[in-house]
Amino acid sequence: RGGTRTIVHEEYEKTSITDRTVSRDLVPFMRSRNIEFNSKKLKPGTQVYPYFDGIDVSRYCTPKLIEITMTSGTFTVGENVRSVPLKKGISAPVFYARVAQINHKEGEYNSATRTYEQNPYNGQLIASSYNSTSTVLNIDTYSLSNETQGEYYGYIEVGTLLVGESSGATATVSDLKLVVDNQSSLIGSFYIPETITSYHPRFESGIRSFTLSS
């Protein structure tokens, strides 16, 4: 069992013309963004479930190692990958991220200082590079959470088509589980959704806890 405390302060939106303030509004809810989580000292092989402020947020969490089924081509390290959603509309997930080396764990996305030894989903050794039969896609979760609605953002769902923008490679998301690796750690990204619709939960600004429970 592990957890991460996330602190998001209240914000004000202000528009000024010369020295005169024309609007000033309290922003009571958290803005949409991705947050990286890196939990350690967990039980290897355990599937855990994420909660934020006591609410199940499994659908908004993406593991660093995404389980995929390749459909064409081979992904390349450093390229951007985008999602093709299963459905249209405001409820459809949108995802845009950078591909890290397949066994990357810590360090630069293309030059890891620590690597994964095994695939946490099947216990097999992880290859040193991507190929046409790769079963995981390693996402650079650091850049994904680097800034509020920056270049990279979003979340995915099972069945989503992922497309490499440089390689043209395609794969479908075969499963989305948070499983502790053999080194007792788990890395992933939590997406705080847009608050413009009641379809997604809203989280008040302030001190909120992100927890993982088995």
Locate predicted features.
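Extracytoplasmic/secretory-pathway segments with low complexity and glycosylation-like composition
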Residues: 1-214
